[in-house]
């Protein structure tokens, strides 16, 4: 889940 949020932010 954290991976998706990190990519979305970038």
UniProtKB/Swiss-Prot annotation:
Its main location: secreted. Keywords: Amidation, Neuropeptide, Secreted. One of its GO terms (cellular component) is extracellular region. The modification Arginine amide is found at residue 10. Expressed in the antennal lobe (at protein level). It is found in: Secreted. GO terms for biological process: neuropeptide signaling pathway. This is Tachykinin-related peptide 6. It comes from Acrosternum hilare.
């Amino acid at each position: 889940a954290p991976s998706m949020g990190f990519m979305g932010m970038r």
